[in-house]
Structures are given as structure tokens and as C-alpha cells.
Amino acid sequence: MPQISVVLPVYNVEEYLRQCLDSLANQTFEDFEVICVNDGSGDSSLSILEEYASEDERFKIISQENKGLSGARNTGMDYIKGKYTIFVDSDDWLELNALEKLYNKIIALDSDILMYKFRFFNQDSEQYSESVFTNLEVIDASLENKNFNYRDVSDILFKISHAPFNKLYKTSFLREAGIKFPENLNYEDLYFFYMVFFKTEKVSVFRDESLYNY
């Protein structure tokens, strides 16, 4: 059983997909699987996935008719085998040490959710940037290296990134919570974040460096 399951929805991202897949294939932490959900792509995304899956058995492909981002994530969640789960968007990419850093942190603290820094890449200027929203600096330093819950950050709750991709989740927690992404609903990320956040007493944060690029 892999330690980490990466859920990767894929829909018409041939231009960016190789960069994303390379960032996963070359992780310093190797005990993971990538559940690639081909959500009815009409471009060469599926053939790119098949190329990587033929060379690396950690990449699994599930193809379905288009259900949208939430539907693809939910399908991926049905196939998770790892102890921990991370969501990655297929036009983004991870730093090569991301899974190693996150795994070590969540194991050390035994958290249900580990939130981490991410950054924006401007394709025009080719510059990276962070914001208070992405770097998690709104979370008080007293909560560093410990678990906390939503009550501890209730005054800044709406300033914390609700994106699903900058979090590592304990899979058993997600299953016990029984929460999936709502389909055919706007702001599905927001719904998912608050539903899981309100159900745990064990949230932690990794702010040493940005590990995700979008």
C-alpha cells in the first residue's frame, strides 16, 4: 500500500500536463501512487497519461465521461489506496521535495490535515509570487509545529486558503468524515474545505517553503 495517493483530475491540459507529471515522477519521496482521472479529454491528454503510465507503474489511469472538476476528484477518491491523500491540478506542479517534506511533517504531528504554502507563477513575466492568502502567514506563530482546530483560527478563518491542492489529508479521516466535492455547484472548493476543517481537531501547517506552483 502506498503512503500517499495523488488525485489528479485531467481535462484538456496537453500544454501543461508533462510538467505536472514530471514533477510527480521525479519526487524525492517515492512511495506514492498517482490516480489520473481523464475527465473526457478531447486533446492528447490521455495519450500523454498512457505514456507515463507505461513507464511508471505508480501512475494509474481512470477514464470517464466529462463530469467536471468535482466529479473527477470524487472519482479519484474512490480509488485511493494511500495512507494520505493530496489533490493536484494537472496544469500545476509540485516542487520535487514536496511529498517528502509534507509526509515527514504530517507523520511527526499525526495531523488529519496539513496545510502548506503555495505560489503563483506568472507566465508572462516568468516570475513567482506569494500573498498572505497563499503563504499562510495569517496563522499565528504560536500554532507552528502543533495541531490546532477551526476555533483556534476563527478570527482569520476566511483568510485561509480554501484550495484543496495545498493540503495533505489523512485518508482515514476523509473517509470517516464522508465528505466529497459537491458536483454542479459553484465554489465547491470552499464547501469541501469548511466541511472537512470543521470535523477535525488536528490541523497543522508547513510554512518553511512553497511546495506547490499554480
Where do the language-model regions lie?
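Short beta-strand/loop segment that forms part of the nucleotide-sugar
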Residues: 31-40, 60-65, 89-90
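Conserved donor nucleotide-binding strand/loop of the catalytic core
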Residues: 46-81
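Residue-level preference for short helical/loop micro-motifs built around acidic side chains
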Residues: 15-18, 31, 43, 47, ...
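N-proximal low-complexity "stem/linker" segments adjacent to membrane-targeting elements
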Residues: 1-26
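Donor-binding/catalytic cores of nucleotide-activated saccharide
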Residues: 69-70, 90-207, 212-214
